[in-house]
């Protein structure tokens, strides 16, 4: 199994309040419980989205946390095939371009991929297996 993390799930984990962070941890723990060999993937777009705020705020500690994480997971590059698929997704679901790209990246990993997100809009994407991050503030 591959857990593809949407940018919002990563930002919840690294920057969110405890309730947000715990929601992501809960989803990841359930993945590991069902498949101890599960892998984690993110898109190159997700890398960019997560690094913007720490760079803008000159938060080197947070940037280092993100970069350390990204060095340990699979990065899905934005190929021409993925962009074409994202275009089709955007046309049929009305998702915003970055979300369509994220969905296409996850779908490119095959049927063993689950998309971890806090955004319910991805439910409109045909074939995308979603693991919803349910945020409960603690």
Annotate the PLM regions.
Residues 10, 47, 122-123:
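A generic structural signal for short hydrophobic patches within well-formed alpha-helices
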Residues 41, 76, 131:
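General small-molecule cofactor/ligand-binding pocket signal
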Residues 57-58, 66-87, 134-138:
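Mobile, glycine- and charge-enriched loop segments
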């Amino acid at each position: 199994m591959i857990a593809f993390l949407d940018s919002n799930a990563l930002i919840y984990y690294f920057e969110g309040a405890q309730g947000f962070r715990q929601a992501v941890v809960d989803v990841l723990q359930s993945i590991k419980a069902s498949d101890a060999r599960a892998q984690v993937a993110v898109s190159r777009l997700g890398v960019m989205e997560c690094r913007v705020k720490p760079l803008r705020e000159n938060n080197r500690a947070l940037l280092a946390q993100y970069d350390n994480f990204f060095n340990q997971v699979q990065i899905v590059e934005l190929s021409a095939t993925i962009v074409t698929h994202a275009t089709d997704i955007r046309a049929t679901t009305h998702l915003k371009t970055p979300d369509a790209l994220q969905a296409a990246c996850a779908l490119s990993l095959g049927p063993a991929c689950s998309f971890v997100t806090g955004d319910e809009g991805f439910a409109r994407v045909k074939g995308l297996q979603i693991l919803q991050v349910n945020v409960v503030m603690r």
